[in-house]
Amino acid sequence: METDRRAFLRVAGSSLVLGAGSVWTAAAQAQALPVSFPGIPNPLEGGVDVIATGYIWTEGPVWVGGEDGHLLFSDVPGNAIYSWDGKRTTAFLAPSGYQGFPIPASLREAGSNGLALGRGGLLIADSGTRALARVDLATRQRTVFAESYQGKRFNSPNDLVVARNGAVYFTDPPFGLAGVQNSPLRELTFTGVFRVTTDNQVHLVTDKLSPNGIALSPDNRILYATDTSGWVAIDLDASGMPAGQRQFVASDKVGGARGDGMKADSAGNIWTSGRGGIYVFSPKGEHIGFIPIAGRVSNCAFGPDRYLYVTNDTQVVRGRIRAEFPGGSAIRY
């Protein structure tokens, strides 16, 4: 079974060498087969437009501020976070993960991955440092606030989401390490989903998944995670810890697609990347929308004016969500 996040989206026979300094070639992108779901509507008013390009592997988009805000996103192997202000893209934080040079061969992805707003700043799943960190949006100073569980270092934190009470949930696969599951750097024997409290206590939510992306329902009572089986829902109790786990959407229900990053909208729908584009599932797990996007899609984020921003291989694209689509008139960002 392939464990590489990008292998989830790869068609049989494709071959890419991944790691710091590697590039995604146009030929490799062309190997992504087109995907369609007859009868499943496209939630967008039109197609998607490229707003930033020329990166290695984009991830972790998050909108910062209101109507006049900006988009932040990671270039994970490039070890940098970039900002798009509606007109141009500039470097926001480099390095965004591993702080040394040269980057050791033991690290496959040295930079930040998932990004989220919380604790009065920017929170990053730091694949290279193998930790969670807070970045002051004004000074850009980094502060690590979680890096181990029961004395053992995390694998390589991948994605995160912040609860209303300030707790941070995150996934910890080994994708950032050379050798992935076989990396000699691994100290934990499992790939977990964790919860970090506001006083930085780390609690294990589950060690029974091969997790990647993560999202919370609007009421914060359901935690969603991607897995090799598809998408999983974890019911949370009043303390924010698991009360049960169930299959939300099985991979074989959507043509064998497996997810990467995802977001929940204000109606409780889950917008998730997968083979061929963005999939939208209702809170009941019904497949209610699909946005076809060429190349490999890693994650998405909502912004003002109903725009959906998508990290897409070497670039970032965006499209406008139809107001009449379920939840479209009240998308939160």
Please annotate each region the language model reported.
Residues 3, 9, 13, 29-333:
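Sequence-structural signature of mature extracellular/luminal beta-sheet repeat domains
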